[in-house]
Amino acid sequence: MHTTDTETFEEQFAIEQRLVDSVVASFDSTTDPRLKELMQSLTRHLHAFIREVRLSEDEWSNAIAFLTAVGNITDDRRQEFILLSDVLGVSMQTIAVSNPAYEDATESTVFGPFFVEDAPEVTLGGDIAGGATGQPCWIEGTVTDTAGNPVPEARIEVWQNDEDGFYDVQYSDGRVSGRAHLFSDAHGRYRFWGMTPVPYPIPSDGPVGKMLAATNRSPMRVAHLHFMVTADGLRTLVTHIFVAGDPQLERGDSVFGVKDSLIKDFVEQPPGTPTPDGRHIGDRNWARCEFDIVLAPEQI
């Protein structure tokens, strides 16, 4: 009896579907309901991708080698897996589903791969540069909840790249610069000296950078400054502020992290302009930026 192409396709489809069903069923005894949901859904979607693109064995071997390389380059100073998540938009999608907009709360964005625990503390009005080079920038604002109440003693972690586009952890000398933490005062106010952010490329010497090059994608990030803000009873905020007027805003951000509400004016101040705290800047420009932070309730 002659077998038609349709019959052959249906037989192949049935073989593939039986495998999917078998793998999904293998998780039926999982006692944690959320873990069961995650593993079964992941299995269905992963197999659907393989079937849709007709993934070859060589392609899958290359994918495994790529993920192995991502793991091998990752250490306590470089998080290549976070970078991979960022450039695929997974980080921003997770943020979108996990941190829905709430009233006037400040919006979240990506964490990024360059956060380091135990950054040094600076006092209010202190300088986070720590010897890093860049245009001095005064940043100030108030931390409140969504009812407008000031939040005293909020812990504010800040970190940024230098004017050459590098974070301290990208240098091999163990320096700590361009990062610190501080606490808001009794009225929720905070202030510090940093550097005017500049755009920079994400690392291109690792597998993620090579992936972007292979797909003709730009590695550039829009100029930004990182914040992570924590306070009792309020939702932890991970966010950036972006520089209004940065040409990279029009070209796009390699990790899809820009939100309009986070674009802020960094107002250039000519040489000789008095600084808010009387600091002597010398014969150079500096900038200032105001960024008020609104924290959502921990439970929404």
Curated annotation (Swiss-Prot):
Pfam families: Dioxygenase_C, Dioxygenase_N. Binds 1 Fe(3+) ion per subunit. It comes from the Bacteria. Disruption phenotype: Cells lacking this gene completely lose the ability to grow on 4-NP, 4-NCA, and hydroxyquinol. Coiled coil: none annotated. One of its GO terms (molecular function) is 4-hydroxycatechol 1,2-dioxygenase activity. It catalyses: benzene-1,2,4-triol + O2 = maleylacetate + 2 H(+). Fe cation binds at residues 167, 200, 224, 226. The keyword Cell membrane does not apply. Its cofactor is Fe(3+). Signal peptide: none annotated. One of its GO terms (biological process) is catechol-containing compound metabolic process. Pathway: Aromatic compound metabolism; Xenobiotic degradation. Involved in the degradation of para-nitrophenol (4-NP). Catalyzes the conversion of hydroxyquinol to malelylacetate. This is Hydroxyquinol 1,2-dioxygenase. It comes from Rhodococcus opacus (Nocardia opaca). The lineage of its organism: Bacteria, Bacillati, Actinomycetota, Actinomycetes, Mycobacteriales.
